[in-house]
Amino acid sequence: MNRQFFLTISLLLLASNTLFAGWVIVQKTYDASEGAQGEIEEILYFQDDKVKMMSEDMATIFDLNSGEMYFINYQTRNYWTGTAQEMEDQVKAAMDEMIEQQLANVPEDKREEMRAMYKQMMAGQTESDAHSRPSDLAVTIEKTTEKSVVAGLPVTKYRVIVDGKLTEEVWLNTDAGIHNEFSVQKFYDFMAGFLKSFQNQETYKDQEAYVQMAKQGYPLKIIDRAGAYETITEVTSVEKKNLSRSDFLPPNDFSEQALTDMQTGFN
């Protein structure tokens, strides 16, 4: 999911049921080796620095202004809401609880030793991640002369070179105005706090050259070679549409739950 986040950005300014022009974007993501048969479809909603990402029965909403986020499960009809810091605190609390559950069957005179060992393992992982931060990565963005059309919109191909290796190819649209609906810098700052709960690690996408490219337009197609598999994300539909504040909130009849009780794919 991290690879798709930089494609999605938005914001809310006015009252609850008032309509504003926003964007609805449909995209598909799949591994190049599997082709279309393994594709996952996602619907993205943008408006005034708010973004909603829907996939099957799940939705994730980010408010870049307030720092609030929602995880919504439409199948179980519940949701979790909070900030990135609150999520990090709850994840840590859940890990501490898991450790205590593991210690329940350990003889009492051995528990403190085992507890210290678990804590050391967790601290060691954090330290390892910190040392692996690629702050010194050489990231170069090459704008090519290659033009194309994706989802009915003109795009220009960019090449992302990381330490001399072609890592991404990005087809960027600069004239539809999608990227004017959000602050790219605000989005990256928000996501840095969000992803901290899952990985204490930067990526080449945090580098200034990459962020500056993202500010120039909206990516309608990406070939990502950074991971073990070549992943392709391609927009299939772009629509400017009136959206309301309620489009970026859980339904009124859904119940709020603790993060650890949510079936979100994050816990």
Regions found by a protein language model. Give the residues of each.
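Sec/Tat signal peptide C-region and signal peptidase I cleavage site
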Residues: N17-A21
